[in-house]
């Protein structure tokens, strides 16, 4: 589970002084556990999550990390949390829960676009809903062109 992505779900962006909600992430985990009894759920969060949440939620984030309920990628990990989410899913043959397209990773991990490998998450009127989705295809990068004046 892309914990950082779900914690930001439905929240105002950082540029508008928004903050992720750890309570929302915890609710998503509980909902997923209820809907998929007996399944292992790996929650991955970027290192910035503990700093971005409100001061009131910060101790809960730190406790979840200390208890191993939430994992963070090691410092300096290329691709940060997204890379760890993908690596865990690949290692265990799991399904990724995220609304991210993982565009920078699609070429090296074509299975990301296979049906059933990614579920999107939506919070609506107190209910978390998880639907199959196929990430948008990564756009090929174009070489930059320069114009002379």
Regions from the PLM with identified roles:
Residues 1-13:
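Metal-dependent nucleic-acid phosphoesterase active-site entry motif
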């Amino acid at each position: 589970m892309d914990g950082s992505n779900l914690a930001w779900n439905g929240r105002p962006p950082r540029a508008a002084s928004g903050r992720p909600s750890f309570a929302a992430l915890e609710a998503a985990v509980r909902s997923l556990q209820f809907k998929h009894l007996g399944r292992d759920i790996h929650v991955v969060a970027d290192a910035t999550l503990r700093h971005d949440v409100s001061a009131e939620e910060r101790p809960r984030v730190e406790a979840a990390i200390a208890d191993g309920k939430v994992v963070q990628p090691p410092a300096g990990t290329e691709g940060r949390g997204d890379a760890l989410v993908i690596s865990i899913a690949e290692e265990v043959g799991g399904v990724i829960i995220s609304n991210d397209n993982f565009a920078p990773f699609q070429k090296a991990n074509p299975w990301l676009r296979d049906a059933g490998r990614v579920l999107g998450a939506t919070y609506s009127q107190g209910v978390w809903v998880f639907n199959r989705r196929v990430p948008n295809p990564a756009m090929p990068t174009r070489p930059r062109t320069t114009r002379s004046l």
